[in-house]
């Protein structure tokens, strides 16, 4: 059987700054990528319908003015939302990381069984300590319905945000939990819950939530950056792990497999 190579539309423009490493990671996972400025979509030079995956990368779109991800989301709502809903209804995939998660949250893309796309169900607010957090954390997959996380358990991954505290009301939380839409939660290195304790939970997120998906499992957003931790050499403990592996006659793999697996799963979705 001929392997399908999905095309990824990597959004760009106005303060987004992770498009290059995000495109690189998707390429390593087996996809083709185009980095596309939002104005080119609005002008009709590129079309969402020509792609299988839309990627909202990290960064600080519009300098986080009016709230992180809000201005960029409004630009999409005012110009491209019909195209985006058509893309969703066609059964394709959308992924958002950090600022991308914030944009998608403001767009209302994480629909519940009781809601429709365009209805906002949650927020990503200022970190509890009112500080920008830039370091590595552990997150655990929660046996969700998400297509991006097949075969993933615990991930060691960097964060870089000042507004990452997930919040929703209790009714929404219970529906997310019931429908297995809570994808990632903050934890310790063994997978034990952070229980909202700092520094395991870096931002005070409600129920330690680091990432969620929509009711179909095809749309996911998360605050941590797996695309920034593609290679083993990027890990803080790399030199120690390298020395231990050397003494044991082993070689450290090039990639952090759990992190690239998110992107491989997206590619494999179109080869089922």
From Swiss-Prot:
Pfam families: GATase_5. Coiled coil: none annotated. Keywords: ATP-binding, Cytoplasm, Glutamine amidotransferase, Hydrolase, Ligase, Nucleotide-binding, Purine biosynthesis. The active site is at residues 98, 225, 227, 235. The keyword Aminoacyl-tRNA synthetase does not apply. GO terms for biological process: 'de novo' IMP biosynthetic process. CDD domains: GATase1_FGAR_AT (cd01740). It catalyses: N(2)-formyl-N(1)-(5-phospho-beta-D-ribosyl)glycinamide + L-glutamine + ATP + H2O = 2-formamido-N(1)-(5-O-phospho-beta-D-ribosyl)acetamidine + L-glutamate + ADP + phosphate + H(+); L-glutamine + H2O = L-glutamate + NH4(+). GO terms for molecular function: ATP binding; glutaminase activity; phosphoribosylformylglycinamidine synthase activity. SUPFAM superfamilies: Class I glutamine amidotransferase-like (SSF52317). It is found in: Cytoplasm. Its main location: cytoplasm. Its EC number is 6.3.5.3, 3.5.1.2. Pathway: Purine metabolism; IMP biosynthesis via de novo pathway; 5-amino-1-(5-phospho-D-ribosyl)imidazole from N(2)-formyl-N(1)-(5-phospho-D-ribosyl)glycinamide: step 1/2. SMART domains: GATase_5 (SM01211). One of its GO terms (cellular component) is cytoplasm. Residues 8-243 form the Glutamine amidotransferase type-1 domain. Part of the phosphoribosylformylglycinamidine synthase complex involved in the purines biosynthetic pathway. Catalyzes the ATP-dependent conversion of formylglycinamide ribonucleotide (FGAR) and glutamine to yield formylglycinamidine ribonucleotide (FGAM) and glutamate. The FGAM synthase complex is composed of three subunits. PurQ produces an ammonia molecule by converting glutamine to glutamate. PurL transfers the ammonia molecule to FGAR to form FGAM in an ATP-dependent manner. PANTHER family: PHOSPHORIBOSYLFORMYLGLYCINAMIDINE SYNTHASE. Part of the FGAM synthase complex composed of 1 PurL, 1 PurQ and 2 PurS subunits. This is Phosphoribosylformylglycinamidine synthase subunit PurQ. It comes from Methanococcus maripaludis (strain C7 / ATCC BAA-1331).
């Amino acid at each position: 059987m001929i392997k399908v190579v999905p095309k990824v539309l990597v959004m760009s423009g106005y303060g987004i700054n992770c498009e290059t490493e995000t495109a690189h990671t998707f390429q390593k996972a087996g996809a083709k990528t185009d980095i596309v400025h939002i104005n080119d979509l609005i002008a009709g030079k590129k079309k969402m319908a020509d792609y299988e995956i839309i990627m909202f990368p990290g960064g600080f779109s519009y300098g986080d003015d009016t709230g992180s991800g809000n201005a960029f989301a409004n630009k999409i709502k005012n110009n491209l939302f019909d195209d985006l809903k058509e893309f969703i209804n066609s059964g394709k995939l959308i992924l958002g990381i950090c600022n991308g998660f914030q944009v998608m949250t403001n767009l209302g893309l994480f629909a519940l069984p009781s809601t429709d796309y365009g209805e906002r169900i949650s927020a990503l607010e200022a970190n509890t300590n009112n500080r920008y957090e830039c370091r590595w954390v552990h997150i655990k997959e929660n046996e969700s319905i998400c297509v991006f996380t097949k075969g993933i358990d615990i991930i060691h991954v960097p964060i870089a945000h000042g507004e990452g505290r997930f919040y929703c009301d209790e009714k929404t939380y219970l529906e997310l939990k019931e429908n297995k839409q809570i994808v990632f939660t903050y934890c310790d290195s063994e997978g034990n819950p952070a229980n909202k304790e700092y520094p395991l939970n870096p931002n005070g997120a409600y129920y330690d939530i680091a990432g969620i998906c929509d009711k179909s499992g095809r749309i996911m957003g998360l605050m941590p950056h797996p695309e920034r931790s593609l290679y083993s050499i990027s890990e803080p403990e790399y030199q120690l792990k390298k020395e231990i592996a050397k003494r044991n006659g082993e070689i450290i793999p090039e990639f952090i497999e759990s992190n690239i697996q998110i992107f491989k799963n997206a590619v494999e979705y179109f080869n089922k």
